[in-house]
């Protein structure tokens, strides 16, 4: 009888441990989602100039007279198997104090040369934004690049995360030492955001991506750190296809 009681108690204890561990995982997943919620709930912002009237997370690191600066970055990276890695994207700095926006479009080609050491060759094309239109500030002779800039749209302009709460059973990571955190979800090709990316980019794989939400800083909010989203289609040693996006709010003196 004593053995039976010990066995029952052992099973109950094990069940409690599993339940508590699972509960902690679910709780942390909810915290990670919530930390991204304020930013992702803003998507889509079709007219980027609306950000002049939107305020991000402020803390005592901000000067009271500083309205802050939004930093937008969208990038598509494609490296077919054993070929060069090509990254194309754009960064904009939207100063809410002066209501002016400048940044650059970039093309970065990374090649494996000199005994496998990677060499990148990034070219930047300065731009500004006027009336929600991206305009090069210097002459560009390459017609292909001019067209890419003219047609460029940031993910924040067409992405939509109203169904974020429906993403379940994510792979959650949290390091309180840094602090850093992430949540990874397997998507399908029927996902709205995946369809939007395939509509705008020539993505050379039929594989459905994983969505990665990753950030650093206090989970409850901080002007220090970052929050990035990434759609990873392929991730191998010599083959990579992924799209990354970020919308950050920083002190104007930091950018």
From Swiss-Prot:
It is a lipid-anchor. A lipid is attached at residue 24 (N-palmitoyl cysteine). One of its GO terms (cellular component) is plasma membrane. Residues 1-23 form the signal peptide. The keyword Nucleus does not apply. Its main location: membrane. Pfam families: DUF576. Keywords: Cell membrane, Lipoprotein, Membrane, Palmitate, Signal. A lipid is attached at residue 24 (S-diacylglycerol cysteine). It is found in: Cell membrane. Belongs to the staphylococcal tandem lipoprotein family. This is Uncharacterized lipoprotein SAOUHSC_00052. It comes from Staphylococcus aureus (strain NCTC 8325 / PS 47).
């Amino acid at each position: 009888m004593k053995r039976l009681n010990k066995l029952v108690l052992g099973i109950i204890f094990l069940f409690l441990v599993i339940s508590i561990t699972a509960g902690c995982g679910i709780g942390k997943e909810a915290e990670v989602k919530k930390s991204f919620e304020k930013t992702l709930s803003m998507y889509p912002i079709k007219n980027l100039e609306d950000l002049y009237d939107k305020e991000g997370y402020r803390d005592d690191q901000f000067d009271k007279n500083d309205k802050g600066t939004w930093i937008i970055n969208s990038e598509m990276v494609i490296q077919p198997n054993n070929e060069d890695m090509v990254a194309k994207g754009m960064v904009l700095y939207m100063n809410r104090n002066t209501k002016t926006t400048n940044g650059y479009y970039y093309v970065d080609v990374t090649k494996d040369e000199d005994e496998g050491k990677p060499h990148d060759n990034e070219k930047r094309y300065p731009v500004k934004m006027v009336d929600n239109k991206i305009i090069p500030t210097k002459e560009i002779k390459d017609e292909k690049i001019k067209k890419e800039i003219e047609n460029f749209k940031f993910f924040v302009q067409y992405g939509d995360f109203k169904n974020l709460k429906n993403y379940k059973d994510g792979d959650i990571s949290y390091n309180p030492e840094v602090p850093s955190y992430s949540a990874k979800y397997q998507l399908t090709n029927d996902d709205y955001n995946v369809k939007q990316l395939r509509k705008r980019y020539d993505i050379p794989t039929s594989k459905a991506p994983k969505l990665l939400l990753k950030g650093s800083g206090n989970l409850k909010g901080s002007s220090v750190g970052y929050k990035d989203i990434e759609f990873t289609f392929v991730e191998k040693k010599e083959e990579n296809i992924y799209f990354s996006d970020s919308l950050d709010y920083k002190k104007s003196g930091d950018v």
